[in-house]
Amino acid sequence: MYQDLIRNELNKALQTLQNFLSDERHIQSIEDAAKLIADTFKAGGKVLSCGNGGSHCDAMHFAEELTGRYRENRPGYPAIAISDPSHLSCVSNDFGYEQVFSRYVEAVGNKGDVLVGISTSGNSANIIRAIDAARAKGMRVIVLTGKEGGKMAGSADVEIRVPHFGYADRIQEIHIKAIHILILLIEKEMVAQG
């Protein structure tokens, strides 16, 4: 009954992935981000990640697989998703939702840490504020965006952009693939240079 729709959805996902894969800049940005994070861990720094909605789930997934595990057993890596419900509700209530991530970065971020901001539009005001707070703390910044990068375009040390202009779920599908590859590369880099 729905088999044609299922095939169509999978083919659209495949096409989005093939379009992303066809541009070497995307491959390089994933490698650059992985090296930046691995170098941060080697220097004693940590990763803070943030996003809204599905991107919030991706930020938590990223931190969880860094602190827990991906494919192989290895030591946990220092990563925190800005996702504590009491922090989010307190700051949203007292200061406004636009400050939920920046307040956390101001409190916990240190020079040499990395902020990973995830936004399919590249226009999330609370992530833009977090980027500003990270810069003020001397942190490096990686963003995962979509479309033309939005207001975040050019704001990061590394941007992994999915140039898809349809529904956001296609961008999120590439984001989670990029996140899994990042973790794989980080693990290889950490083992290779111990």
Curated annotation (Swiss-Prot):
Q: Which reaction does it catalyse?
A: 2 D-sedoheptulose 7-phosphate = D-glycero-alpha-D-manno-heptose 7-phosphate + D-glycero-beta-D-manno-heptose 7-phosphate
Q: Give the EC number(s) listed in the UniProt record.
A: 5.3.1.28
Q: What class of enzyme is it?
A: isomerase
User: Which BP terms from GO are recorded?
Assistant: carbohydrate metabolic process; D-glycero-D-manno-heptose 7-phosphate biosynthetic process
Residues binding substrate, per UniProt? N52, G53, G54, E65, N93, D94, S119, T120, S121, S124, Q172
- What are the SIS domain coordinates in residue numbering? 37-194
Q: Which GO terms describe its molecular function?
A: carbohydrate derivative binding; D-sedoheptulose 7-phosphate isomerase activity; zinc ion binding
What's a single GO CC term here?
A: cytoplasm
- A Pfam family of this chain: SIS_2
| Pathway recorded for this protein | Carbohydrate biosynthesis; D-glycero-D-manno-heptose 7-phosphate biosynthesis; D-glycero-alpha-D-manno-heptose 7-phosphate and D-glycero-beta-D-manno-heptose 7-phosphate from sedoheptulose 7-phosphate: step 1/1
Cofactor binding: number and manner: Binds 1 zinc ion per subunit.
Q: What is its main location?
A: cytoplasm
Q: Which UniProt keywords apply?
A: Carbohydrate metabolism, Cytoplasm, Isomerase, Metal-binding, Zinc
Q: Which SUPFAM superfamilies match?
A: SIS domain
Q: Enumerate the cofactors the protein uses.
A: Zn(2+)
The protein's superkingdom reads: Bacteria
> Which PANTHER family does this one have?
PHOSPHOHEPTOSE ISOMERASE, SEDOHEPTULOSE 7-PHOSPHATE ISOMERASE / DNAA INITIATOR-ASSOCIATING FACTOR FOR REPLICATION INITIATION
Q: Which family does it belong to?
A: Belongs to the SIS family. GmhA subfamily.
Any extra remark in the record?
A: The reaction produces a racemic mixture of D-glycero-alpha-D-manno-heptose 7-phosphate and D-glycero-beta-D-manno-heptose 7-phosphate.
Q: How does it assemble?
A: Homotetramer.
State the protein's purpose.
Answer: Catalyzes the isomerization of sedoheptulose 7-phosphate in D-glycero-D-manno-heptose 7-phosphate.
Record's protein name: Phosphoheptose isomerase
Q: Which organism is it from?
A: Sodalis glossinidius (strain morsitans)
Q: What is the lineage of its organism?
A: Bacteria, Pseudomonadati, Pseudomonadota, Gammaproteobacteria, Enterobacterales
Q: Which gene encodes it?
A: gmhA
